[in-house]
């Protein structure tokens, strides 16, 4: 799909960095003063600003003496796994002796604190149930537990429904009555804040002193991993959490499981970036919840012996390889469906709805994301569960709030969607198979009402051109050092015109393009690589010049470090 390369506007304002390039990058990301660049823990928001935190802390204080059975119920993604592991570790460090956890199986119980999951917790003897990264939409499960006289503490970050579950306490920055400034906390961030508040209460009660209290900065590796892997916007507070965790990972002050996953991914933790967490560690951890059971991922993060961590990391790596194979097949089928839709309607629908009965439920979200990236359309991919219900995973584009779209469809067609939930850019839902054709039409029409043609034009936003003297390792190191980059605080991407002096396909499937480039202004020769190219278009030796969108990357090979351009998009220039 042809895309537009556009440059980010740099707002007029005071300088925020003495370095001209950094000043440009920061202001393009709406940084207005140097305080917003502070990544120290002292600048972290206070837990007491979270609505419901006092009630939540009191529930845990009451469960401390006499010791009550606490069961943590997590989610089956990386945010859920890190939230679960963090809560188990923190509560045990605080002195809670009877802490257990449950992670619903995607294929058996589905998402959230359902009644079957509540029954599993009761079998474990639960006296206080605490959700992490889920629960705000789990009305039935919470009500079921309350009827049994069991107290429930919900911690979540997902957008709440109109009717909240009848929990004893709910901590969620997205509650309408919550004034917490950072609405982008991941589930693991919410859990971390609750544990900080409990520790503070225990100090107040004399259970700990400042000297004897557990050091919860040791849990920031989990906070960083869950925050980056869940692709939540990196506002200043999340940047602090992610950066502090990343620094601890680089110093190897982290879970053995993270080190083991880095080993199987052939990554050096001492050089870790947020991209490594998001694209190497996160997918392997997520593979457990996609194809098997996320308990594998939680056990990896709880492992205190390297041999056990390595064993589980190898299991996750194999699951991830299997996931890639399943994904490749599903993506080909999805592209074929899109081609058929285009042939049928003369153009691709504004909102793409895909369904194959035998598709793997655990891989739907990735396929939706891949098709969304390829066609720049909102996408929902469905598969059938064991009871004949269609489970869907939705991914959106800028300008379309996916959960709001589903809310509108639900309000206008109350019997269409069985249940749904999510965020602006990602959501999940269930419908009946007989409603698929109607839903396909309604979703497309709703998206068409919401978006115009301009929204459907894929755009690559860049930070403009680099000068010849900026193509060096020092610039790449500088950009790496001032991250943490991610969602809402994007890694710098540049554009410019280049001569293509050499190009060749590389990789096992010959789907990566290696190039030798010279900037239009001359002065330097540059190695470049473009991953996952369209092999029907490239290599093309007739293309001698192109405008490229690219990032700076440090290529390390056999102890040597060199600059490499990581090319995101190629726009050929006619000579």
Swiss-Prot record:
<dbReference type="InterPro" id="IPR041122">
    <property type="entry name" value="RecJ_OB"/>
</dbReference>
<dbReference type="InterPro" id="IPR038763">
    <property type="entry name" value="DHH_sf"/>
</dbReference>
<comment type="function">
    <text>Single-stranded-DNA-specific exonuclease. Required for many types of recombinational events, although the stringency of the requirement for RecJ appears to vary with the type of recombinational event monitored and the other recombination gene products which are available. Involved in genome maintenance but probably not in phase variation, which contributes to the virulence and disease.</text>
</comment>
<dbReference type="Pfam" id="PF01368">
    <property type="entry name" value="DHH"/>
</dbReference>
<dbReference type="GO" id="GO:0006310">
    <property type="term" value="P:DNA recombination"/>
</dbReference>
<keyword id="KW-0540">Nuclease</keyword>
<dbReference type="InterPro" id="IPR003156">
    <property type="entry name" value="DHHA1_dom"/>
</dbReference>
<dbReference type="Pfam" id="PF02272">
    <property type="entry name" value="DHHA1"/>
</dbReference>
<dbReference type="GO" id="GO:0003676">
    <property type="term" value="F:nucleic acid binding"/>
</dbReference>
<dbReference type="GO" id="GO:0045145">
    <property type="term" value="F:single-stranded DNA 5'-3' DNA exonuclease activity"/>
</dbReference>
<keyword id="KW-0269">Exonuclease</keyword>
<dbReference type="InterPro" id="IPR004610">
    <property type="entry name" value="RecJ"/>
</dbReference>
<dbReference type="Pfam" id="PF17768">
    <property type="entry name" value="RecJ_OB"/>
</dbReference>
<comment type="similarity">
    <text>Belongs to the RecJ family.</text>
</comment>
<keyword id="KW-0378">Hydrolase</keyword>
<protein>
    <recommendedName>
        <fullName>Single-stranded-DNA-specific exonuclease RecJ</fullName>
        <ecNumber>3.1.-.-</ecNumber>
    </recommendedName>
</protein>
<dbReference type="GO" id="GO:0006281">
    <property type="term" value="P:DNA repair"/>
</dbReference>
<dbReference type="InterPro" id="IPR051673">
    <property type="entry name" value="SSDNA_exonuclease_RecJ"/>
</dbReference>
<dbReference type="InterPro" id="IPR001667">
    <property type="entry name" value="DDH_dom"/>
</dbReference>
């Amino acid at each position: 799909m042809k895309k537009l390369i556009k440059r980010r506007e740099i707002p007029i304002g005071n300088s925020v960095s003495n370095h001209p390039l950094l000043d440009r990058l920061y202001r393009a990301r709406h940084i207005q003063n140097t305080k917003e660049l502070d990544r120290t823990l002292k600048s972290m928001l206070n837990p007491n600003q979270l609505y419901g935190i006092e009630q939540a802390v009191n529930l845990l204080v009451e469960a401390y003496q006499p010791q009550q059975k606490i069961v943590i119920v997590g989610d089956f993604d990386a945010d859920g796994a890190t939230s679960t592991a963090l809560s188990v570790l923190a509560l045990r460090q605080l002195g809670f002796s009877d802490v257990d956890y449950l992670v619903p199986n995607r294929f058996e119980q589905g998402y959230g604190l359902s009644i079957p999951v509540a029954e599993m917790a009761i079998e474990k003897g639960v006296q206080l149930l605490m959700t992490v990264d889920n629960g705000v939409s789990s009305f039935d499960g919470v009500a079921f537990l309350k009827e049994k006289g069991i107290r429930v503490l919900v911690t979540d970050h997902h957008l709440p429904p109109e009717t909240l579950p009848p929990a004893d306490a709910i901590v969620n920055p997205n509650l309408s009555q919550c004034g917490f400034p950072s609405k982008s906390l991941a589930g693991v961030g919410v859990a971390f804040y609750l544990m900080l508040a409990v520790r503070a209460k225990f100090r107040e009660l004399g259970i700990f002193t400042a000297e004897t209290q557990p050091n919860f900065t040791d849990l920031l590796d989990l906070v960083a991993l869950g925050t980056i892997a869940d692709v939540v916007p990196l506002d200043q507070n999340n940047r602090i959490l992610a950066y502090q965790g990343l620094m601890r990972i680089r110093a190897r002050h982290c879970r053995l499981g993270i080190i083991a996953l880095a080993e199987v991914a052939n990554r050096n933790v001492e050089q870790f970036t947020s991209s490594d967490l998001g694209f190497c560690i996160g997918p392997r951890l997520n593979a457990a919840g996609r194809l098997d059971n996320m308990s594998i991922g939680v056990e990896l993060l709880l492992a205190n012996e390297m041999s056990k961590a390595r064993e589980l990391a190898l299991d996750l790596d194999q699951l991830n390889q299997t996931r890639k194979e399943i994904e490749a097949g599903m993506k080909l089928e999805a592209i074929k469906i899109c081609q058929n839709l285009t042939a049928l309607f003369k153009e691709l629908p504004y909102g793409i709805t895909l369904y194959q009965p035998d598709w793997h439920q655990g891989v739907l979200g990735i396929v939706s994301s891949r098709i969304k990236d390829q066609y720049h359309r909102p996408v929902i991919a469905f598969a059938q569960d064991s009871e004949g219900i269609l489970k869907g995973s939705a991914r959106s584009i800028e300008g379309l709030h996916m959960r709001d779209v589903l809310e509108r469809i639900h309000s206008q067609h109350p019997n269409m969607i069985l249940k749904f939930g999510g965020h602006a850019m990602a959501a999940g839902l269930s419908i009946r198979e007989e409603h698929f054709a109607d839903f396909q039409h309604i979703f497309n029409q709703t998206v068409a009402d919401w978006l115009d043609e301009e929204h459907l034009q894929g755009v690559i936003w860049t930070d403009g051109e680099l000068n010849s003297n900026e193509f060096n390792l020092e610039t790449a190191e500088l950009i790496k050092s001032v991250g943490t980059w991610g969602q809402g605080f994007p890694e710098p991407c540049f554009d410019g015109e280049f001569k293509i002096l050499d190009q060749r396909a590389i990789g096992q499937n010959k789907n990566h393009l290696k190039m030798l480039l010279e900037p239009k202004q001359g002065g330097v020769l540059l190695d470049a690589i473009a991953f996952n190219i369209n092999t029907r278009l490239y290599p093309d030796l007739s293309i001698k010049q192109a405008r490229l969108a690219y990032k700076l990357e440090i290529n390390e090979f056999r102890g040597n470090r060199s600059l490499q351009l990581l090319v995101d998009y190629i726009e050929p220039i006619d000579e």
